[in-house]
């Protein structure tokens, strides 16, 4: 009995506790990411942004949460009720489940599987089904158009993201996210005879792929300037037109969870994860999760600045960029990286 408890029950209890802790921390982080998004946008427009609820508006997201929870959900008369309510739940559950394999520091991961990046890519690809379900079940033309746009957009840019992942796989030789970070201890800077630093991270040696991944991440998460599925000036609010109260909140939660995931992936694949900028003792003393969080926040700041400055693309421009620019570029980089690695004997 003791053997059964220590072998099966105790590890399950520990994993459930870790999952709940990660979920709570992630939800709080998303709340402040949403606030930061609104604050940065307001600052660019010379406004103050949310500043009433709590000091400097720090509790605004929690006030919005309570507002959505206590509002009455309204379901359109012609909607498919079951699918209409299931769609936001599918979206938010898929977005949150991807975080199970994301290492926040060395050893800080719930499931350290060998195909972590492939797992994230597969689960992220399924999120489009929640949007399609919501757009179709609403029985309205604007949500359906937004859902169709979202499906085409996410499929188009997943191809480029896939080639970026292949490039990183060629350089590292592993799909394990922890191995990808640890491989960035040495890189281009070390080859040039420099001490271990941020010059070893993949952002420099794979700079074109870093740009492709960053822009594709914007499109994959429906962020401006690629927010065509929910374009306010064209489709009112796209696939979320008919949603309100808790279902709308779940769609927004899933969207920002996906945004935070892309920031974390950018940090892991190209910015050294939890590694310090320079390998010296005083920076190594700082916990890795702090470096990881700071880098992810920097990437999100770039996301927010793009939203504030770059106008929305037309739909044909969006498709042309994905298929005629990013796809050939990413495919060419895969071939070039493979050739260079083979030429230098690193393959």
UniProtKB/Swiss-Prot annotation:
Membrane topology: Multi-pass membrane protein
Keywords annotated in UniProt: Cell inner membrane, Cell membrane, Membrane, NAD, Quinone, Translocase, Transmembrane, Transmembrane helix, Ubiquinone
Ranges that cross the membrane: 13-33, 50-70, 82-102, 115-135, 161-181, 198-218, 263-283, 286-306, 321-341
Localization (cell): Cell inner membrane
UniProt-listed Pfam families: NADHdh (PF00146)
GO CC list: plasma membrane
Electron transport in keyword set: no
Assigned EC number: 7.1.1.-
Signal peptide per UniProt: none
Record GO terms (molecular function): NADH dehydrogenase activity; oxidoreductase activity, acting on NAD(P)H, quinone or similar compound as acceptor; quinone binding
Any one GO biological process: aerobic respiration
Catalytic activity: a quinone + NADH + 5 H(+)(in) = a quinol + NAD(+) + 4 H(+)(out)
Task of the protein: NDH-1 shuttles electrons from NADH, via FMN and iron-sulfur (Fe-S) centers, to quinones in the respiratory chain. The immediate electron acceptor for the enzyme in this species is believed to be ubiquinone. Couples the redox reaction to proton translocation (for every two electrons transferred, four hydrogen ions are translocated across the cytoplasmic membrane), and thus conserves the redox energy in a proton gradient. This subunit may bind ubiquinone.
Family to which the UniProt record says this protein belongs: Belongs to the complex I subunit 1 family.
Subunit structure and binding partners: NDH-1 is composed of 14 different subunits. Subunits NuoA, H, J, K, L, M, N constitute the membrane sector of the complex.
Protein's name in the database: NADH-quinone oxidoreductase subunit H 1
Native species: Rhizobium etli (strain ATCC 51251 / DSM 11541 / JCM 21823 / NBRC 15573 / CFN 42)
């Amino acid at each position: 009995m003791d053997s059964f408890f220590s072998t099966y029950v105790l590890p399950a209890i520990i994993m459930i506790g870790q999952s709940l802790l990660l979920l709570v921390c992630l939800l709080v982080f998303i709340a402040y990411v949403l606030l930061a998004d609104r604050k940065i946008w307001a600052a660019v427009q010379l406004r103050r942004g949310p500043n009433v609820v709590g000091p400097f508006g720090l509790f605004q997201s929690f006030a919005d949460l309570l507002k959505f929870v206590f509002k009455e959900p309204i379901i359109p008369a012609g909607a498919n009720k079951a699918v209409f309510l299931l769609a936001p739940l599918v979206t938010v559950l898929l977005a949150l489940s991807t975080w199970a394999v994301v290492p926040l520091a060395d050893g800080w991961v719930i499931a350290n599987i060998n195909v972590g990046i492939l797992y994230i890519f597969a689960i992220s690809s399924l999120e489009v089904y929640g949007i399609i379900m919501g757009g179709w079940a609403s029985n309205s033309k604007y949500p359906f158009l937004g859902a169709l746009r979202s499906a085409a957009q996410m499929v188009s840019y997943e191809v480029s993201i896939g080639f970026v992942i292949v490039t990183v796989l060629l350089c590292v030789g592993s799909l394990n996210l922890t191995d990808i970070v640890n491989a960035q201890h040495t890189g281009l800077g070390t080859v040039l005879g420099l001490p271990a630093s941020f010059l070893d991270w993949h952002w420099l040696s794979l700079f074109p792929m870093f740009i492709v991944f960053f822009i594709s991440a914007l499109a994959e998460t429906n962020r401006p300037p690629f927010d065509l599925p929910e374009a306010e000036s064209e489709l009112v609010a796209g696939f979320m037109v008919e949603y309100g109260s808790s279902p709308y909140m779940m769609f927004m939660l899933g969207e920002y969870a996906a945004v935070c995931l892309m920031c974390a992936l950018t940090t892991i694949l190209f910015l050294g994860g939890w590694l310090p900028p320079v390998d010296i003792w005083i920076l190594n003393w700082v916990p890795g999760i702090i470096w990881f969080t700071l880098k992810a926040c920097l990437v999100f700041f770039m996301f927010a600045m793009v939203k504030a400055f770059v106008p929305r693309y037309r739909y044909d421009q969006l498709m042309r960029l994905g298929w005629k620019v990013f796809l050939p570029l990413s495919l060419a980089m895969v071939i070039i990286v493979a050739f260079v690695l083979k030429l230098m004997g690193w393959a």
